[in-house]
Amino acid sequence: MRIAKYFRTIKLLYRSISHAVDMKEFQSLEDFLENCGPIKHGQASQSLDLGCGGKPRNPFKASTLWGVDIASSAQSQIIRADLTQEPIPFPDDSMDFITAFDFIEHVPRVVYLPNVRYPFIELMNEIHRVLKPDGFFLSHTPVFPFSACFTDPTHVNPITSETFSLYFDNQRQWGRMYGFRGSFAIVNQAIVGTHLLSLLQKRN
């Protein structure tokens, strides 16, 4: 009886992580982006890095780079905002690229007081709003089942290899039950070390 239960448990555990186990792996962000094929943008492209700290990253080599962070900065291209509570401080359809490196795992899935809110869903709505049509969102985040997903006590939003494809893509759109209003195509996803790299393209 105990052996049968053991194997049933193994089967359930494998089912929950098999999607991540079967994903492509790359050694670096550069290798991942190269595998995504040509990413077209205009000469005067703009990129926004969310949760950028003091140094926004620019993997798409956009001509203009902006950053948003919860901490104030003397750099004029870094704007202070708490994206768990505030909108992205840029106009609609203004960015060719939005990136988030080790950031979305810090954005709560649900807040109950004073009213029920879904900050992660709200952030994805904001990303969709600020991106230009066919713009790209690149996420780099610790992924389940790696311990990096949980070790940091400020990681409150564990991401799996299926989070984006089930809740935010233009097929299943499960996020709509929580207020997601946008739509993304999943261009590519892969594992790099203990992290999931996801490239999404805005769809209207």
What do these predicted regions represent?
Residues 109-120, 148-156:
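Short, flexible/disordered intra-domain loops and linkers
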Residues 184-204:
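Core SAM-dependent methyltransferase catalytic element
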Residues 134-141:
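Conserved beta-strand signature within the Rossmann-like core of class I S-adenosyl-L-methionine
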Residues 142-147:
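Short "lid" loop at the C-terminus of a central beta-strand within the Rossmann-like core
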Residues 1-93, 97:
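Conserved N-terminal segment of class I S-adenosyl-L-methionine
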Residues 117-133:
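A short glycine-rich, Lys/Arg-flanked "PGG" loop and its adjoining helix->strand segment in the class I
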Residues 97-103, 109:
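A short beta-strand submotif of the Rossmann-like class I SAM-dependent methyltransferase core
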Residues 149-181:
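Conserved Class I S-adenosyl-L-methionine
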